């Protein structure tokens, strides 16, 4: 089976993480869409493993958590009338927990917006931290049980509850209602009110929408398969944490957090992809039967 050179595959992965759609990459790089999809699936699986292995023992002071909306195949409100909609069509939520100082994505989760998803995120977050932290979230009620279950009393936790004005008219439904104020609510421990904020994680939500085409609103670049959506988030997370230079830090978030000493590259990821998928070993050729002439 033919395989693209490593440099070509690395460029495809980079373009996926810089906001290009799969079909746009296929056109610009003169490859098939299936080739781009296979590169995403192979690398995404490895990136998820690398995140689990490398983002451990994180020493953070302040963690901010939030969830960002996207959809698979069609939006939730149109699932009932959509043609040939798969069983997992509808809204998808990506949960993230970010170190406010190093900007490291400590934990992420692709799922729904249920209490169970919040529990899984917080359990994962707790397993990667080495010390007591201050956690800030929005007012989503699912966080209350999740933080309590994962951290017990060993956490300083507060919620930032935003107060909004009237909802925009249907014509302006993509314009959010005006935020008229915020309320900081202490939930557990002794959180420092000065650092009770979700500003960094909300800013990162915009970064995610800019870097992953399937998160961009009002386009047809949305996900068509939940599995590929999860692979893209895993690919982006490793890219953001270990490969991409953060514009303010002048290094990667992983380096700032002290869990990496140098930059990684997609060549490193592809080396693991190739190691996990070695080429088939051909058997010996021959012997052949002697050809009998007419």
Which residue ranges define each predicted feature?
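Residue-level recognition of single "structural anchor" positions
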Residues: 1-294
């Amino acid at each position: 089976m033919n395989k693209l050179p490593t440099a070509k595959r690395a460029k495809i992965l980079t373009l996926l993480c810089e906001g290009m759609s799969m079909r746009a990459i296929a056109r610009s790089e003169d490859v098939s869409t299936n080739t781009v999809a296979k590169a995403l699936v192979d690398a995404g699986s490895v990136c998820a493993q690398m995140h689990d292995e490398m983002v451990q023992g994180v020493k953070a002071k302040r963690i901010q958590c939030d969830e960002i909306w996207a959809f698979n195949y069609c939006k939730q409100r149109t699932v009932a009338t959509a043609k040939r909609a798969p069983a997992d069509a509808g809204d998808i939520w990506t949960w993230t927990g970010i170190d406010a100082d190093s900007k490291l994505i400590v934990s992420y989760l692709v799922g729904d917006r249920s209490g169970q998803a919040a529990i899984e995120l917080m359990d994962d977050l707790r397993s990667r931290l080495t010390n007591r932290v201050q956690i800030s979230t929005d007012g989503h009620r699912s966080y209350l049980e999740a933080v309590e279950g994962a951290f017990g009393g060993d956490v300083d936790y507060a919620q930032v509850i935003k107060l909004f004005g009237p909802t925009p008219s249907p014509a302006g439904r993509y314009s959010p209602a005006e935020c008229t104020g915020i309320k900081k609510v202490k939930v557990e421990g002794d959180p420092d009110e000065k650092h009770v904020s979700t500003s960094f994680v909300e800013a990162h939500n915009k970064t995610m929408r800019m870097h992953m085409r399937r998160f961009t609103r009002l386009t047809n670049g949305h996900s068509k398969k939940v599995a590929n959506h999860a692979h893209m988030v895993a690919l982006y997370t490793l890219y953001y944490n270990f490969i991409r230079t953060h514009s303010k830090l002048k290094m990667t978030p992983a380096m700032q957090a002290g869990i990496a000493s140098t930059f990684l590259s997609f060549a490193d990821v592809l080396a693991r992809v190739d190691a996990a998928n070695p080429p088939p070993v051909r058997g010996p050729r021959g012997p052949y039967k002697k050809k009998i002439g007419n």
